[in-house]
Curated annotation (Swiss-Prot):
One Pfam family of this chain: She9_MDM33
Taxonomy, superkingdom: Eukaryota
Keyword annotations: Coiled coil, Membrane, Mitochondrion, Mitochondrion inner membrane, Transit peptide, Transmembrane, Transmembrane helix
Bilayer topology annotation: Multi-pass membrane protein
Keyword Transmembrane annotated: yes
Gene: SHE9
GO CC terms in record: mitochondrial inner membrane
Keyword Zinc in record: no
Stated name of the protein: Sensitive to high expression protein 9 homolog, mitochondrial
Function: Required for the maintenance of the structure of the mitochondrial inner membrane. Involved in mitochondrial morphology. Causes growth arrest when highly overexpressed.
Subunit structure: Homooligomer.
Coiled-coil blocks: 74-196
Length: 447
């Protein structure tokens, strides 16, 4: 019996069983309802299955890129800290060297006449120059290791460090191959010597066997000794042969490995160069895009703003110039009117009447307007003469501008003749001389 039934009273047990049965029935119904696949869920699952490999590969590449960026930033920070420490160490060494080289007997620089310090002594200038040279030397010595490590970090980022390791492996394999070839030559010589010694011993044995019926006790001892030596020579020859075969196999294996390593290095360098070339190409495209963007920004935004600003400033300057010119002109007219009025007042004070103007009988004149302002007649006549002179000068200037515009706008022979005042013959001669000079200049340039 389960424990939970023992912990409950008997009146509660049927009710608990009914609740459990209803829960199981409800879960079975839900399972039966959920077990039927819906078409929308099926399409989503298929799409998820298709996109899952791409998402996983993209996620892996993103993680690798982030890891590489973090590693590169850590390396850069490490090298910057190392460079800063190297510079500080160089400064400490320089200060220590200066303290050691100082001489207390050669430090007098008091100017007793002016009660100040003497500056720019030759020794001080030389010390400053040497200080800069020594500082540069210390900096170069201290930064040499940093530059080396920075170059190594750059190779790690670009992937050339592996190629460097492969190149070192190839160098080591070449050295091993040379050593193996040298040992192989020695083993071949030893094998040749062993074969020669065995052949000689066999020749001696054969000679003894040919006169076997004529052996003496010395020949028997010689045969026994030669037979033992022949067994030793056979063993030495077999050992030399085995060593030679093993060395030849090793030499062949090293040659094959070296050949494969060289091919691998060539292939990896090609991939690395393609990667660098692709990176430089993308960098060039990015720089070109930035230049085009800057050009568009300058041409579409800055240039119109600059042109509008220049136009506004030019208009303001022209307005100010016209206002200044009108102000000066008004001042001149005011001065002139003041002088004329002073002269007329002086003449009236001395009792001198103004000279009457001669009347014109050819053309009837309109009656003069009444002097309501109380101005004398001489002032009005002077102002009228000044206005007429200004109008005449302005008309002459306007006619001169119109002649120039007409001559530029319609460059005909009659217009040029009327503008320059030359006869037609002179204009033709002038054109002929200009054409001849142009032809001569073109011939000289072409030859």
């Amino acid at each position: 019996m389960p424990i939970y039934q023992l912990a409950l009273p008997r009146s509660v047990l049927p009710r608990c069983r009914a609740v459990r049965y209803s829960r199981l029935l409800h879960s079975a119904r839900c399972y039966s309802q959920d077990s039927q696949p819906k078409p929308g869920n099926t399409i989503l699952q298929q799409l998820r299955k298709k996109l899952e490999p791409f998402c996983n590969s993209t996620k892996d590449k993103l993680e690798q890129t982030c890891a590489q960026v973090r590693y590169s930033s850590m390396q850069l920070r490490y090298h910057l800290e190392k460079a800063r420490a190297s510079v500080q160490e160089a400064n400490k060494k320089l200060v220590q060297q200066e303290r050691e080289g100082e001489n207390s007997m050669l430090t007098f620089n008091d100017d007793l006449e002016n009660k100040s310090k003497i500056v720019d002594l030759p020794s001080e200038r030389e010390r400053k120059r040497r200080q800069w040279s020594r500082k540069l030397e210390f900096y170069i010595d201290s930064l040499q290791e940093t530059i080396f490590t920075a170059t190594k970090a750059l190779n790690d980022v670009t992937g050339y460090s592996s190629i460097e390791k492969l190149r070192k492996s190839i160098d080591m394999m070449e050295t091993q191959l040379q050593e193996t070839k040298r040992k192989l030559m020695q083993l071949r010589e030893a094998h040749s010597d062993a074969v020669a010694v065995r052949n000689q011993s066999q020749r001696q044995v054969n000679e003894l066997l040919q006169r076997k019926h004529m052996w003496s006790p010395g020949d028997l001892e010689s045969f026994t000794r030669l037979y033992k030596e022949d067994a030793d020579n056979v063993r030495r020859q077999e050992e030399a042969n085995a060593s030679l075969k093993a060395m030849e196999a090793k030499e062949e294996e090293l040659s094959n490995s070296l050949h494969r390593a060289i091919l691998t290095r060539y292939h990896e360098e090609q991939i690395w160069s393609d990667k660098i070339r692709r990176t430089s190409t993308w960098g060039t495209f990015i720089l070109m895009g930035l230049n085009i963007l800057l050009f568009l920004v300058v041409q579409l935004l800055l240039e119109p703003w600059k042109r509008r600003r220049l136009t506004n400033s030019f208009e303001d300057k022209v307005k100010r110039a016209l206002e200044d010119h009108s102000l000066q002109h008004n001042l001149v007219l005011d001065r002139l009117s003041d002088r004329i009025s002073e002269k007329i007042d002086a003449e009236m004070v001395h009792g001198i009447a103004p000279v009457p103007l001669p009347e014109r009988t050819e053309q009837p004149e309109q009656p003069p307007a009444a002097t309501t302002s109380g101005q004398p007649l001489g002032l009005r006549e002077a102002l009228a003469s000044v206005g007429a002179a200004i109008a005449a000068e302005f008309g002459f200037f306007q006619a001169w501008i119109a002649d120039h515009v007409r001559a530029i706008g319609g460059p005909t022979l009659s217009a040029l003749q009327g503008f320059s005042g030359w006869p037609v013959l002179h204009i033709d001669l002038y054109n002929t001389v200009i054409f001849t000079c142009g032809m001569l200049l073109g011939l000289l340039v072409s030859h």
